[in-house]
Amino acid sequence: MAKIYATGKRKTAIAKVWLTPGSGKLTVNGTTLNDWLGGHEAIKMKVMQPLLLTKQEKSVDIVSVTLGGGYSAQAEALRHGISKALSAYDIAFRAILKPKGLLTRDSRVVERKKYGKRKARRSPQFSKR
């Protein structure tokens, strides 16, 4: 089977994911997942969630490149990309991943700053006198 390509997004982070049948290696930006995260278990579980749900953690190799955003947003973008790649790999996985919301793009992004305001919604301090 050929390589399967998918992209995942979250906030301003983008993850490009290539999935191939293999032994379960997961490479992010040229390093292993543990090195990339610095041993952060909660974020690691978030990234591994689609693989664990479909029981593919030992049967596919994943190579990915992430850019933009912070670690948490990159991890969620990576999870989104892995989910999309798995659903392209086997259509049966779609029925497992879709109810968990892993194929849905989280559209929440930072609200823009408005003129006359200090931030998106914070107004300057009001003085009555």
Swiss-Prot record:
Presence of the UniProt keyword Ribosomal protein in the record: yes
Gene Ontology molecular function, alphabetical: RNA binding; structural constituent of ribosome
GO biological process terms, semicolon-separated: translation
SUPFAM superfamilies for the chain: Ribosomal protein S5 domain 2-like
Keyword entries, A-Z: Ribonucleoprotein, Ribosomal protein
InterPro entries linked: Ribosomal_Su5_D2-typ_SF, Ribosomal_uS9, Ribosomal_uS9_bac/plastid, Ribosomal_uS9_CS, Ribsml_uS5_D2-typ_fold_subgr
Residues that span the membrane, as ranges: none
GO cellular component, one term: cytosolic small ribosomal subunit
Pfam families found in the cross-reference section: Ribosomal_S9
Family: Belongs to the universal ribosomal protein uS9 family.
Name of this chain's protein: Small ribosomal subunit protein uS9
Organism from which the protein derives: Wolinella succinogenes (strain ATCC 29543 / DSM 1740 / CCUG 13145 / JCM 31913 / LMG 7466 / NCTC 11488 / FDC 602W)
Gene from which the chain derives: rpsI
